[in-house]
Amino acid sequence: MHNKTVRHLTILILTIAGIFIIDQNIKSLFVDGYRYYSDCIDLILVYNKGVAFSMFAFLDESLKYIQLVLVFGVFGYMLYLNQLCYAIPAGLMLGGAFSNIYDRFIHGGVVDMVYWHCGFDFAVFNFADVMIDVAVVWILLLNFKPKFCKNHS
């Protein structure tokens, strides 16, 4: 393996592991009973059976296997690209995705806890969801502004 590949893989795997560990630790607080209520944001426990905004909840048990295939596909594609500039954003995305899929296997649904209701009701979400959103924006930026990625080809 080339140094570039080893470095890319190391950064990718460490980022995935870091996001997974942080997210699962946050979620364990809520599974264990922590709650917080305020005028704008409540921290509550919700098990989301679907994906964003509970879409595809009708897929029930199949959803976690479909997501697993998609996530391993993205992981494989990131390895194929072997672009160092994608290692951290891909790690954020994959770490969040693996954590949410893990929830489906362990809890029967994704553990969500942040409920924004200041001015309007927003979907309940978690740290992994935020990391996935940040990663998508970062990856789009790298794709549309190649100058941000020195080894972008």
UniProtKB/Swiss-Prot annotation:
Q: Which UniProt keywords apply?
A: Aspartyl protease, Cell inner membrane, Cell membrane, Hydrolase, Membrane, Protease, Transmembrane, Transmembrane helix
Main EC class the enzyme belongs to: hydrolase
Pfam families in alphabetical order:
Peptidase_A8 (PF01252)
The compartments listed are:
Cell inner membrane
Q: Which NCBIfam families match?
A: lspA
Describe its function: This protein specifically catalyzes the removal of signal peptides from prolipoproteins.
Q: Which HAMAP family match?
A: LspA
Q: What is this protein called?
A: Lipoprotein signal peptidase
Species whose genome carries this gene: Sulfurimonas denitrificans (strain ATCC 33889 / DSM 1251) (Thiomicrospira denitrificans (strain ATCC 33889 / DSM 1251))
